[in-house]
Amino acid sequence: MPKRRRGEKKTTYFDYNLLFIIIFLLCFGLVMLYSSSSYTSANKYGDSAHYLKLQARNIAIGLVFMFYFAKKDYHVWRKFGRLAYWGALGFCLVVLAKVPGLTRSSHGQSRWIQVGPIGFQPSELAKIAIIIYLAMLIERIPKQLDKVSSMAKVGIRLVPLVLFVAVNNLSTAIIILGIAVCMLFVASPKYKEFFVVAVLGVLFIFAFINIASYRSDRVEAWKHPETAGDKGYQTMQALYAIGSGKLFGKGLGQSLQKLGNVPEAQNDMIFSIICEELGLFGAVCVILLFVLMLWRMMVIANNAKDLYGALLVTGIMSHIAIQVVLNIAVVTNTIPNTGVILPFIS
């Protein structure tokens, strides 16, 4: 929000179209979360609405913060760029060190920091931190980004955080790299340099896949899920769910695959249940909602008062877009399993 002169009437700009899309996706997400998780939740916790209640609580907290920060001048985040970056880096180090009493494991990986009832993944914090930090850096040297050396200096500053995240969570590291590339491209759209960056990014991903054997196993399971045993089971069941939904689906709440067949149906595989219950028609509608959301964000970025505001929106837009594409690509077995959730719905 720009500063106003003395005597000027304060004006705020609020995109109600974007707000409506967000609220609709959140409400739709609650419905689908309950539908996909009620069976598992009842068996595990004795309460079919356990996951629904947790999600509703988190949404309520998120909406409070959203409306609070929507009234604030976004330039205030510029002051926290370095703090956000170094804070995220520090939390990632805590997870890597597996500090007793501060970290907990999930699905065999130590990715969480747990302090009493409060738990979070530093890798998720790193996504937001990189947006705030990179927007601050780029705004200070926009014209210098035409030089390859200046772009390389910015990229080098991101390397420690990306590497620390990639050790335990390669998919999130890929998302962070994608966000950074999109923000740099908006600031300096030089195609040759970004082709080089893309090649280096592919080499980075290839190297990390081969470092850990379980990542190589995921690639093999992706190529031949039908013969991969337990490693390909989730993918095969998700594909069965998608195929059985046909054009208009079996009907809301009528999924059979959610009855213990699709592991983590309420998490990264929820799109397969959407396809089964609402069919291809429902899946396309969900994708169109995300497209509309990204379009509204692009409009906001184009009309931002300054480069910093445009970069913040670009970073958030890139984050959501990359995560949606990765999630749907995993569910449809277009790429190996990454564990990336579907924003606003999972």
Positions of predicted regions on the chain:
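N-terminal Lys/Arg-rich, disordered targeting/topogenic segments
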Residues: 1-6
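Extracellular/periplasmic helix-loop-helix junctions in multi-pass membrane proteins
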Residues: 331-345
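Hydrophobic alpha-helical transmembrane segments of multi-pass inner membrane proteins, especially
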Residues: 23-27, 35, 45-234, 272-333
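N-terminal membrane topogenic signal
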Residues: 7-22
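TM-adjacent membrane-interface loops and short helices in multi-pass inner/ER membrane proteins
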Residues: 221, 225-267, 271, 278-282
